[in-house]
Amino acid sequence: MSRPLVALSLGLVLFRVLSAALFVTQPGFTDAYYYVDVAARLAHGQGLTADFIWNFLEAPRLDPLPVPSHRFWMPLATVVQATGIAALEPVLGVFRSAQAAIIAVAAFVPAAAYVSARSLGASSRAALAAAALAGLGGFTFAPAWVTLDSFAIAALVGTMFFVVFSRAAFGDVRAGAIAGALVGLLFLARAEGALFGLALVALAFRRSSRAAGIAGSAIALAIGLAWLARGLALPGPAAIALAKGVFIVRYEDFFALNPNGSADLATLIGVRAGALWSDLVVALAALLLFLAVPLVLGLRAGWRFPAVRAFAALALLIYVAEALIWPLHATRGSYFHSLAAFYPFAMALVALGGETWLARLEQNARRLATAGTLGAVAILAVFGLTNWDASFNVPYRARVAALEAIPPGPFLAIDAAAWRWISDRSVLLVPSDGPETAACVAIAYRAQSLVLEPAHFSAYQSLYDGNGSPWFVQRAESGAIRIYSLVRNPGCPSPDQIIR
């Protein structure tokens, strides 16, 4: 590794530490809360289990706590964070030790982008620019690299897949096996990572790379099947995660005990068309718009490389799959998450395309253009961090302020993973079915309180507006957060009768 790359990587690590210290001071959003909640239990020897219910697909029959975790989300982010907690909790505490593990992974993202750019024929200067672009992350990924999520993990694993894939495409069996292991790891970080395995399957159909493709596909398949077998072994219907992930037509139904939404063909098509447009905007935003042109130039310049063709094919495949198969999830963060696996390699292509285009200019003009681009990305990164602060730290402080108004014991809330972290108590999801079902959930788990925030399911609007409910009465208010007490049993049947 060259000295300039080492110096740049260390500088970017410092930038991440400052980002974490000043802005990303708590998990922030549901995914991250979930990962670290379970990571703490895993680090303390309690396995992949949760003592809260963020979604009823993890407690399909209102199963007693703790329940097996990760029926929907993938486990690698939790495992990485648990490693940090096990090693550093006595010194840094749970949150900072989990975050330290993520920052350690993110520290290698610039180097991965550098190696990618060099593998495509870019000069060392252009490769350093790619490393800086990937490391800074711009408006979208600057905070993502230090959040307790899968962004940094997917970025590193996905980028190394493209680097190794080129060698596998020329018949290197060892490279094919490594690529397969990377696909397996990417799948354990993000479910759509399994689609990367199709690139290895394609190699198996070519005589020159057949052995490499078969080796990689077999390893990726073995890892994937092992995780799927774990899911099948858990109690409850295994198809529930698929049904809630793919077949819902209203996003609220994802959080219902009994999803009952229906839609005609026009609505189904409209939702997917909307997701295609929304995801395109997200992709352009992740590229900071002005990097889209050098990316296209980089694709043209590097098209002769198998990794570049695989990058283009997989990027298009995942864009279409997210919008058509998981449209409701794609437009609520899933597609943005999937872009992390592509981002550093995309920055390598941006550097390659930029170098190709700037070659026609004088040296001073090239330096000015490069410095201007990096400066703009750095400024946008700072804006991204301040936006993260406003988007996630402000609601966090409101929840902390409301905590003392919530009576002791378990309670119901719309973001159970977040409230579990904040309250250090068992928290159950407020079912989107409505207050009557919520009362039954509360009784099943011996909870006496329900918390409603400004963002709540439509079935609770009347209760939130103060119109009352036969089962809950308001007992306290903290800002826009309202706390209700359970006052009546609606005559709940058994869980098997509640859940159809």
Q: What is each PLM-predicted segment?
A:
Residues 15-19, 210-294, 318:
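Membrane-lumen/periplasm interface segments of specific transmembrane helices
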Residues 167-172, 195-221, 228, 300-301:
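Perimembrane helix-loop-helix junctions
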Residues 97-121, 159-163:
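Transmembrane-helix motifs of polytopic, lipid-linked glycan transferases
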Residues 201-205, 274-319, 350-356:
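Hydrophobic, aromatic-rich transmembrane alpha-helices
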Residues 369-420, 426, 431-444, 453-454, ...:
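Membrane-embedded, lumen/periplasm-facing catalytic core of multi-pass transferases
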Residues 151, 157, 309-310, 330-361:
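Hydrophobic/aromatic-rich transmembrane helices and adjacent perimembrane loops
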Residues 130-135, 159-164, 175-190, 197-204, ...:
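Membrane-interface alpha helices of multi-pass inner-membrane proteins
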Residues 6-9, 125-129, 181, 198, ...:
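Signature aromatic-anchored transmembrane alpha helix within multi-pass, membrane-resident enzymes
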